[in-house]
């Protein structure tokens, strides 16, 4: 049995869970999420917790057991606390600006790159420059991608990072806050 799949999911008081066949809907103070689970698993609500069980011990059921439990647990956490992906933008003149549901990124191109933010996702930008780890002279800006759907938050963060990935010589670009970069040595020149 899956070690992750057999753990019960606690349901906080503010959260309402509706199970309709293979569809699980979770409603909480931050919003509402729904997920269609694979037919190999079944979700059962007992008192103030959810249990994800397999229908049988077939290989597909074993493979999807832990995944299904994690998806439901992330939905419960998302509607109560939400998810945040912390990021940094480093480089001279590199900026972020949020207007409505559009994010304009100025990252060394001749034009700002605009990204449409999906519904339920927001970007919070800290306008104060902070020193960057592993660098003596560089400063950057911290920002965070916030939402209730963990997958959507990760997708938008990856989309933003892809605008200007880190370059290994000066360390400029957009990075996750937890990402580390080993700078490469540049050319040594003629002697």
From Swiss-Prot:
GO terms for cellular component: cytosolic large ribosomal subunit. Disulfide bonds: none annotated. One of its GO terms (biological process) is cytoplasmic translation. Keywords: Ribonucleoprotein, Ribosomal protein, RNA-binding, rRNA-binding. The keyword Protease does not apply. GO terms for molecular function: rRNA binding; structural constituent of ribosome. The keyword Ribosomal protein applies. Part of the 50S ribosomal subunit. Belongs to the universal ribosomal protein uL6 family. This protein binds to the 23S rRNA, and is important in its secondary structure. It is located near the subunit interface in the base of the L7/L12 stalk, and near the tRNA binding site of the peptidyltransferase center. This is Large ribosomal subunit protein uL6. It comes from Cyanothece sp. (strain PCC 7425 / ATCC 29141). The lineage of its organism: Bacteria, Bacillati, Cyanobacteriota, Cyanophyceae, Gomontiellales. The gene is rplF.
